[in-house]
Amino acid sequence: MSNITINKILARQILDSRGYPTIEAEVILSNNTKAKACVPSGASVGKFEAVELRDNDKNYYNGYGVTKAVNIINSEIAPQIIGMNTLNQEKIDNTLIKIDGTDNKSRIGANSTLAVSLAIAKAAASTLNIPLYQYIGGINAKVLPTPLINVINGGMHADNNLDFQEFMIIPNGANKFEDAMRMSAEVFFKLKQILKSKQYNTSVGDEGGFAPNIKTNNEVFEIIIDAIEKSGYKMYKDFSLGLDVAASTFYKDQKYKFADYEFNTQELVEYYKNITSQYPIISLEDPIAEEDTNGWKLITQELGNKIQIVGDDLFVTNCKLIQNGIQNNLANAVLIKPNQIGTLTETFNAIRLAQKNNYNTIISHRSGETEDTTISHIAVAANCGQIKTGSLSRSERLAKYNELLYIEKQLDISAIYYGAL
């Protein structure tokens, strides 16, 4: 097995869940094993993310084409990767990093490197005839993540008046992942009924959650809690709530402007203290803009010992930024998005650094997704403990949940559900 090499790499342009072009890479090994990987794309993008290479030709897919990236894979990356040992993932990923030669993948694109990196890992697992989570995580890969399920979409993920990007339910009281899915689906059904009864629109946003024009954030909380309780569940015991605020999207001139509010940092932190004491909110993602370092210090100091404070735009799956956060006591959890950094190895380095320093880790999808289920395997492989992959509608979201259901059955009695955060 150790002498099985990469024989061919083929990239092509496909479409993601929003109809935007993205990359699919196919790897063929010397023993004719084949594997494919597709990469996602974000709508709310952190300033410090690795660069996603687009064509920027306004006459072709409105500038969103990825033919440049596809050509780079086929003509530049492939010749330097072909012939390498399939099982040496770290060496392959380091070669991809070297080919790019920049700090942020700006030359060949993180979408190019990630597609190749993931396809090779999947091919390696396939040729060894073991699941991907076991190949990259070993015998300790057995923790099924608690899902943070986005039931109401707002912000840049929906065409409505809600400023906060995601309102999530967290089934922390389930005994296994299968139960978490059942409980959450029941709440999702009930939520739809309640929204209809209040004459709110039940169309869905990019990530599959409902996207109604609800007037206030507090009303959203009340409606979700009502759906949970009318489904026969109790707050905290069975479910808690989470928010992805995406505060950078409404931060300007050192002020946070959303709904009818205009807050400075101190006032915004007080607002969060109020809503987290009033409602069972146990996770806040990007509650502060990425460049507001003092704000991150303040909210971590004020709420970090009570709830989960998640950095997404703050860290962008980058070890240097995570290390800076650790040293300066910014946040207590890291959102992990492989396409923010560009290779499987760098993704795992970010996870390990966070976990080593007692930061929670949450593997995450993007708003523009495909049917690729690699993040489900990464969640289990790295024992991340939590996953964000959208709501309980749209098949590109359900594909990840269904893969986790399959993994739980495969692990059988070895499977452990992470549960409470």
From Swiss-Prot:
This is Enolase. Its main location: cytoplasm. Its cofactor is Mg(2+). One of its GO terms (biological process) is glycolytic process. GO terms for molecular function: magnesium ion binding; phosphopyruvate hydratase activity. Pathway: Carbohydrate degradation; glycolysis; pyruvate from D-glyceraldehyde 3-phosphate: step 4/5. The keyword Chloroplast does not apply. The keyword Lipid metabolism does not apply. Belongs to the enolase family. Binds a second Mg(2+) ion via substrate during catalysis. Mg(2+) binds at residues 244, 285, 312. It is found in: Cytoplasm; Secreted; Cell surface. It catalyses: (2R)-2-phosphoglycerate = phosphoenolpyruvate + H2O. It comes from Ehrlichia canis (strain Jake). The active site is at 207 (proton donor), 337 (proton acceptor). It holds the Pfam family Enolase_C. It comes from the Bacteria. The lineage of its organism: Bacteria, Pseudomonadati, Pseudomonadota, Alphaproteobacteria, Rickettsiales.
